């Protein structure tokens, strides 16, 4: 973990390293799984790391509920719809799910993804990376948030499943093609 609270590819911890919300989200999930599994780190402690990660996630949040790839002031601080779910889920896993950034992110998700998921579209409505995290964040929140998000995503996704159980690459899978569409979809359920 870098001093800014985020993580970088290849676990680069030098000052000014390329930390981003995507890599940070993966590490938050790993730390939370380790915590639930009773695994104790050899250096530092999980709660401190999660507090720092929450701080980093807040630095990547925007007032409108979007999240940026990198924190403000870095080379890629562009707000991206695909990062809202990872930002909200990370804050939830860090114990900061009631933060303003998490609440605004959930509000953004409901306003902008509360429509039927379009499996074949080549836009953010079919971005499995976005929904991989968004489904988990909405489920963690529960209530009306989960009901609305699940309704928008579930039926279209189940309807896209082939008779052999696979999911064809959708309109916005990224470079992983069939592997991405199946792994991302299975994890979303």
Q: Model-flagged regions — what are they?
A:
Residues 1-155, 162-189:
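An alpha-helical repeat/solenoid feature that recognizes helix-turn-helix modules
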